[in-house]
A protein has these predicted regions:
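Charged/polar low-complexity intrinsically disordered segments
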Residues: 2, 15-18, 37
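Basic polycationic patches enriched in arginine
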Residues: 6, 18, 28, 49-52
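Intrinsically disordered, low-complexity segments enriched in serine/proline and basic residues
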Residues: 30-31, 42-43
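Carbohydrate-interacting regions of secretory-pathway proteins
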Residues: 78-497
Length: 497
């Protein structure tokens, strides 16, 4: 509904009219009504930009023609249709609310600042950004200069929808968790063919040479002057990119540009880069991905060759301390005040295991790798990968090699990627020769060669670390830790170089 001092134009159901107007100084004004969608929303946007004097002077007979002309204008201005289900609008089409300036800057340095200095620095960047960013016709426009634009919100697992349009010779990108970047550039610029411009936009360009995702799988850019559409999904560091409907990056790890020895930051803002040429953005929506959906995506990605090892009903296919474990709600759970090793009946040399686990507050368990089912898995097996509620106060003073994901007593995993207690987590473990890699919720937290380890916790020997094969299992430590969706993929007996 559009109201002026004289005319009322109904463009939706009565429900959409609520809170559509307010009165001030004798005039009625259209206000932002988030319930207006599609054609109604576009018409509202267009009418709200017409001079009030024009609307007040308009005759009823002119309004139908006016509406027709506005409908035609919708396609020219590119106003968004309905917000996709489950997504939130993170650019309001009017101003820079929800965004701040931020150049290419190591987020760790920002985090080290005092709150006062951090606020001051962001304010400086934002003032710079305001000189180069503007809003035109619901489009976010940058002139090719100034600070980047970053969301005020920070995100962990999410899906981003965003359209862009740029010009020849421009170079831009989208930083994810403040980390560069999903690349945008001129795919016709021959001077940059040597660094991959001819392959097109959408790749994780700052990944190491040869790394998965560095280059897009195909050229998907539209010609200059046309809008391009990105769909970007990130779970931990696992990143997928669709450009104009083409899947150009498939669940690749985005490397931490600022510290390649560490995983990508656990959370961070989305940043729109400016790099020497005008670029326009519109239709920016974001959906945070819940843990259960994130785990399902990670489980189903590149799942060829995996064999389920748990039927969800009983302990068929498992041996060892079976009296100390139970099946509850489709998961294997260690009984409280019980322990021991529950292991597969099959042996494995090199393999990948995927599973989900749930740790109660202060809970402790472990993954027994190449175990013989006897003794203490931390020493008698190749290793015990710690399963622990690491952030519980009981464990504040542990050795770094005792926290979750660590090869117990030998190699420390990175911290900060475990979900809260009583929440399911996804974990993938790759065992290849003496090398072992642990990926937690899409983040690689351990990647080491145990053959190179020479220092041990408390100088305790680990005679089992050179075992070439054995069972896979769970090393219970008296806490009701649960495991489900367990699958294993065999790898060639000869380790990869």
């Amino acid at each position: 509904m559009i109201l002026t001092g004289r005319w009322v134009l109904c463009i939706g159901s009565p429900e959409t009219h609520r809170n559509s107007v307010f009165e001030a100084k004798g005039f009625r004004y259209v206000t932002h009504n988030k319930s207006l969608k599609g054609f109604y929303w576009a018409t509202y946007l267009l009418f709200s930009r017409l001079p009030r004097s024009f609307l007040m002077a308009a005759k009823p007979t002119l309004l139908p023609a006016l509406i027709c002309s506005l409908v035609v204008s919708v396609s020219q201005y590119g106003f968004a249709a309905e917000v996709p289900e489950g997504f939130q609008v993170i650019f309001n089409g009017t101003d820079l609310t929800g965004w701040h300036g931020m150049p290419h800057f190591d987020p760790r340095d920002l985090a080290k600042m005092t709150p006062e200095n951090r606020t001051k620095k962001i304010a400086e960047w934002t003032e710079d950004a305001k000189q180069h960013w503007s809003v035109e016709n619901e489009e976010l426009v940058n002139d090719g200069h100034g600070a980047y634009l970053a969301t005020d919100g920070e995100y962990t697992d999410y899906e981003l929808l965003i359209d862009y349009k740029t010009v020849a010779l421009a170079d831009s990108g989208i930083y994810l968790k403040a980390n560069p970047q999903v690349q945008i550039w001129d795919y016709t610029e021959e001077a940059k063919f040597n660094i991959g411009a001819d392959k097109g936009s959408g790749g994780l360009w700052n990944n190491s040479p040869g790394a998965a995702g560095k280059d897009p799988s195909e050229l998907a850019d539209k010609p200059f002057g046309e809008w391009n559409s990105f769909r970007i999904r990130q779970i931990g560091a696992r990143t997928s990119v669709w450009l104009n409907g083409k899947h150009v990056v498939d669940n690749a790890i985005m490397e931490n540009y600022f510290d390649r020895e560490n995983p990508l930051f656990a959370k961070g803002p989305i940043c729109l880069q400016t790099h020497g040429g005008e670029i326009r953005w519109r239709n920016i929506y974001l959906r945070e991905i819940p843990a259960e959906e994130a785990d399902k995506i990670l489980t189903e990605s590149h799942a060829d060759g995996f064999e389920s090892k748990f039927n969800g009903t009983d302990l068929t296919g498992w041996s060892g301390a079976s009296d100390n474990y139970e099946v509850v709600d489709g998961a294997i759970r260690c009984k409280a005040s019980h322990g021991g090793i529950l292991h597969t009946t099959d042996e494995y040399a090199n393999f990948v295991v995927r599973l989900e686990f749930n740790v109660p507050p202060s809970g402790n368990n472990g993954l027994a790798i190449r175990t013989d089912g006897k003794g203490d898995a931390a020493y008698a097996a190749m290793c015990e990968l710690q399963v622990l509620d690491s952030e519980h106060q009981n464990y504040a003073k542990l050795d770094a090699r005792q926290y979750h994901g660590s090869a117990y007593g030998m190699a420390a995993a990175k911290r900060g990627f475990l979900r809260p207690a009583n929440t399911w987590n996804f974990q993938e473990v790759t065992v290849d020769g003496s090398k072992i890699k642990v990926e937690l919720n899409g983040n690689i937290i351990l990647n080491t060669d145990l053959a190179t380890v020479t220092e041990y916790l408390a100088n305790s020997p680990h005679p089992g670390k050179s075992r070439p094969s054995g069972f896979f299992g769970f090393a219970g430590h008296n806490d009701p830790v649960s495991f489900r969706n367990i699958s294993i993929k065999r790898l060639p007996d000869t380790p990869a170089p």
